[in-house]
A protein has these predicted regions:
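Phosphate-binding P-loop
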Residues: 1-5
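Hydrophobic anchor at the beta1->P-loop junction of P-loop NTPases
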Residues: 8-10
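The conserved Walker
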Residues: 14
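Switch II (G3) loop of P-loop NTPases
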Residues: 56-64
């Protein structure tokens, strides 16, 4: 089970299902998931309702040029805000990810996909 401070890194092509996985994570944590959408232009969306649940901070780093952009925008501070961080296109900031990050890679789109989960602490597997 995911807990405050956990980071989930999602990588896959456009349309692979990264946002769908994020929707499942928010729902699994008891948050309202209908409004989950890719934060391509906002960079980060916060899902915090209901307030008694662990919040999810959902990032899309596709448009960032690298780790320096992430830090300059103060986005690394979300790692310490007591929520679960879910990061689409996480390879853009790979050097900033905590060692215990759950990494999910999605290969393919459409009806056939290969999903690989690297979960160093066994939270999901």
């Amino acid at each position: 089970m995911l807990k405050p401070g956990d980071v989930v890194a999602l990588d896959g092509d456009l349309g692979a299902g990264k946002t769908v996985i994020t929707r499942g994570i928010t729902e699994g944590l008891g948050l309202i998931s209908e409004d989950v959408c890719s934060p391509t232009f906002t960079i980060v969306n916060e899902y915090t309702e209901p307030a008694d649940k662990v919040p999810v901070f959902h990032f899309d780093t596709y448009r960032l040029s690298g780790e320096d952009d992430f830090i300059a925008a103060g986005l690394d501070e979300y790692f310490y805000r007591g929520g679960v961080c879910v990061i689409e296109w996480s390879s853009v900031i790979a050097g900033l990810l905590p060692k215990k990050t759950v990494k999910i890679t999605i290969l393919g789109t459409g009806s056939e996909r290969k999903i690989t989960i690297d979960d160093p602490e066994g939270r999901l597997c």
